Amino acid sequence: MASPHVRSSGISVHVTITIDPANTSAFLAAFRRIYDIVAAEPECTYFEVFQSLEEPGVFRFVENWSKDVQWFKEVQLTKAYYTPYIEATEPMWIKPRSIKYFGRFSGEWLTVKPENN
């Protein structure tokens, strides 16, 4: 049963990609273009990139979308602009990519301070 605090629309997508840390510069160069394109999508309300402090080759992308998981899988993930990014970066992956979907809690559970930027 869903929590009463989870919003009825919108999701948070957490993508984890693991590469050899020696490929970090090449990976980020290939990722930059797709990051800009995805972040510009009107349904993408938030996009932040993280790198593990314990494992430098582990990257986490957190994307918030105004749509649901079905839309994300059927519409967003099928866009042609992902193909060059996958072709360029997948050979760098040393583990399979992980994609996890989360329901977003209502606004009472959201805080973003100016210092976060």
Where do the protein language model's features map onto the residues?
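Short, solvent-exposed alpha-helical surface patches in well-structured domains
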Residues: 26-29, 74
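Short, surface-exposed ligand-recognition loops at beta-strand->loop->(often short) alpha-helix junctions
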Residues: 18-27
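Short, well-ordered beta-strand segments in beta-rich or mixed alpha/beta enzyme
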Residues: 11-18, 48-77
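An amphipathic, aromatic/His-enriched active-site/gating alpha helix that lines ligand/cofactor pockets
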Residues: 6, 36-45, 64-101
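Residue-level signal for secondary-structure boundary sites
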Residues: 25, 69-71, 107
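Glycine-rich beta-strand-turn "strand-cap" elements at beta-sheet edges
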Residues: 1-11, 48-57, 84-117
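Alpha-helical structural elements of signaling/regulatory helical domains
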Residues: 22-23, 53, 81
